[in-house]
Regions:
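Membrane engagement elements in two modes
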Residues: 1-57, 156-166
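Short structured motifs
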Residues: 46-52, 66, 101-106, 130-134
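Short, solvent-exposed loop/turn segments enriched in Ser/Thr/Gly
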Residues: 58-65, 139
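Asparagine-centered strand-capping/turn motif at beta-strand->loop junctions
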Residues: 66-72
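Short, hydrophobic/aromatic beta-strand segments
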Residues: 74-82, 94-95
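Intrinsically disordered, low-complexity Pro/Gly/Ser/Thr-rich segments with frequent PxxP/GP/PP motifs
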Residues: 89-130
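Terminal connector regions
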Residues: 123-166
C-alpha cells in the first residue's frame, strides 16, 4: 500500500510540474502576440527649433520634436529614442530621449490611432567638419534636418527596437 501511494504522489508531482511548464509556455506565447502590433508604429522628425546660439563658447542648442504615431490596436509606450542628427545630409551630433527611469504606468501612452510628440535637446559644438552647417544654423538660414536612429516601443508584455530614418 505504501509503495502504491508513493507512486501516486510522484505522478501528481510530475503532472503538476508539466502543467507549470505548459502554463509558462502559454505566457511566453501570449506575449509574442503583441509583436505585430508594436511594429505598427511610425516616427517622424516633426520640428527643429534653435534654442540658443552661444558665440562665446561656440555651440548651438536645438530642440528636436519627434512625432510618434500608433496605428496598432494596443496601447504602447516609448521609453527610448536614440538618434544621429544631420543638417543638409551632414552628421552634426547624437542625442537621445529616455524615460526608462519612469515606471511603465507613468510614461506617455500611445493609444490606438494617436500621435504623441517627444522632445529632445541636442548641443552642437563648432568643429572644422561641421562649420558650414553650423554657420547656416547660427545665421538662421534654411537647413534640411534629418535623423537616423532607433526607438524602443513596448507594451506590458513585449519590448522591441525599431530602426528609423527620416
Amino acid at each position: 500500500m505504501m509503495k502504491c501511494l508513493s507512486l501516486q504522489s510522484k505522478m501528481i508531482l510530475y503532472v503538476a510540474i508539466g502543467a507549470l511548464f505548459a502554463f509558462m509556455g502559454g505566457i511566453v506565447y501570449y506575449s509574442t502576440l503583441d509583436i505585430p502590433e508594436l511594429e505598427k508604429s511610425e516616427i517622424e522628425l516633426y520640428s527643429v527649433e534653435v534654442i540658443e546660439v552661444n558665440n562665446f563658447e561656440n555651440y548651438i542648442s536645438l530642440k528636436n520634436t519627434f512625432l510618434i504615431k500608433n496605428f496598432g490596436e494596443k496601447t504602447v509606450t516609448v521609453p527610448v529614442i536614440s538618434y544621429e542628427f544631420f543638417a543638409n545630409g551632414k552628421f552634426i551630433g547624437t542625442s537621445n530621449f529616455s524615460a526608462e527611469d519612469i515606471p511603465l504606468t507613468g510614461r506617455a501612452l500611445l493609444i490606438s490611432g494617436t500621435e504623441v510628440p517627444f522632445t529632445t535637446k541636442i548641443k552642437i559644438d563648432l568643429t572644422e567638419e561641421n562649420e558650414n552647417e553650423y554657420m547656416k544654423i547660427a545665421n538662421g538660414e534654411h537647413v534640411d534636418y534629418s535623423a537616423d536612429g532607433l526607438y524602443t516601443i513596448e507594451t506590458a508584455w513585449q519590448v522591441i527596437d525599431v530602426e528609423f530614418e527620416n
